[in-house]
Amino acid sequence: LHRRRHSFPTRRSSDLVPSHGAESVLTTIAEAGSLLQPEPDYRPDVVSFVSAPLEKALPICGQIKVHLNVSTDVDDTAFTAKLMEVFPDGRAYNIRGGITTIAADLPEGQTYTPGQTAKVCVEMWDMNWTVQPGSCLRLDVSSSDFPQYAVHSNYAGVWSEQEKTRIAHQKILLGEGSFVELPLHEN
């Protein structure tokens, strides 16, 4: 996947990245399922990566994982990932999405030091999708996907117990260690 940019701020809780097309939205049926997505990098807090067009069909069957080397200026934060198929005419539809936190991916008992590199893995629900020849894959990374996922306060601790929020500045470190793991199905 080709990089467009690799750092982004989180937003205040009044300006979150909205869920648009999702597999676990319980608040409104209008946003559920695979829906037409906005353009790549449509907000300053969304980083998009786009592949070259595929020469042949790509059957995906199972759990998609997005491995990222990241850093932030706070002691915990969330990272979301949304994988999409971009058709030759430019229309993009979400395939799957997921979320994780830095704390969730640390070994038991360890804490994150702001500014250090951390490895996170966004694990998505199992699925079956065939990306068509001529289409591209697009991955959007952010720190919110609301209301599909609860708002992260950018403080360490249990999300639901936090009384305040703050803006975090995220970085995705490209190269070895940051990649998308696709479960491919051979016909």
Segments from the language model and where they lie:
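Short, small-residue-biased leader/transition segments that mark boundaries at the very start
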Residues: 1-2, 6-13
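Glycine/threonine-rich phosphate-binding loop and adjacent beta-strand/alpha-helix elements that clamp
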Residues: 11-187
